[in-house]
């Protein structure tokens, strides 16, 4: 039909939409943490978890975890074009359950990765992410946040967070899967 514009299917608030894709692609999506990662949601009458991960060079991605006995075929994700963000909703997944993304490369290799947007993870030596409910965290730092407004940050000590590359990279071909270093 000429002149007909097809509207995008109405997205749920937690789903990746066209604006999210645009802002993320521009590097200006300052709330992308609300979309990527694992989020406890209600989808109609079903409670579960909405998963989303950016994997632009993957042939396929699935979610594996305690809830599906780490089965790589149980929960495939859908590729959202044009940026290669993979998404899926899995009913019945609960808080504190462990999961990873199984990424299939174009050479057919399967790589298991922790969620870069996870809010909680298992302790080392394990590398799985954990589903958590950040909406119901009871913050107890009101006094500190109020005092912080009066500080001159230019004259205060600074903390630098180290993102550990070992959680995403391994030495290829090493049986012990040795961690990379910054050297």
Language model segments and positions:
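Short loop/turn segments at connectors of secondary-structure elements within structured domains
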Residues: 57, 71, 95-97
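The feature marks proteins involved in alpha-glucan
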Residues: 2-46, 80-175, 181
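Extracytoplasmic/secreted proteins and extracellular or luminal domains
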Residues: 53-54, 156
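Structural beta-strand segments of beta-rich domains
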Residues: 47-51
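Short, surface-exposed loop motifs enriched in S/T, G, D/E and P with embedded aromatic residues
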Residues: 72-81
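Short proline/glycine-enriched turn/loop motifs at strand-loop junctions of beta-rich domains
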Residues: 54-61
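Short beta-strand elements bearing conserved aromatic residues within extracellular beta-rich modules
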Residues: 61-63, 99
């Amino acid at each position: 039909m000429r002149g007909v514009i097809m509207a995008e299917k109405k997205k749920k608030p937690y789903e990746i939409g066209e604006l999210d894709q645009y802002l993320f692609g521009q590097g200006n999506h300052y709330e992308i943490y609300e979309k990527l990662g694992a989020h406890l949601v209600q989808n109609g009458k079903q409670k579960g978890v909405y998963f989303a991960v950016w994997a632009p060079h993957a042939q396929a991605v699935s979610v594996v975890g305690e809830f599906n006995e780490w089965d790589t075929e149980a929960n495939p994700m859908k590729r959202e074009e044009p940026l290669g963000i993979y998404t899926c909703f899995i009913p019945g997944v609960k808080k504190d359950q462990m999961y990873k993304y199984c990424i299939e490369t174009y050479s057919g290799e399967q790589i298991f990765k922790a969620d870069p947007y996870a809010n909680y993870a298992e302790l080392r030596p394990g590398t799985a992410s954990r589903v958590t409910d950040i909406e119901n965290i009871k913050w107890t730092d009101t006094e500190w946040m109020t005092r912080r407004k009066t500080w001159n940050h230019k004259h205060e000590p600074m903390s630098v967070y180290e993102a550990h590359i070992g959680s995403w990279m391994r030495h290829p071909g090493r049986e012990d899967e040795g961690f990379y270093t910054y050297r």
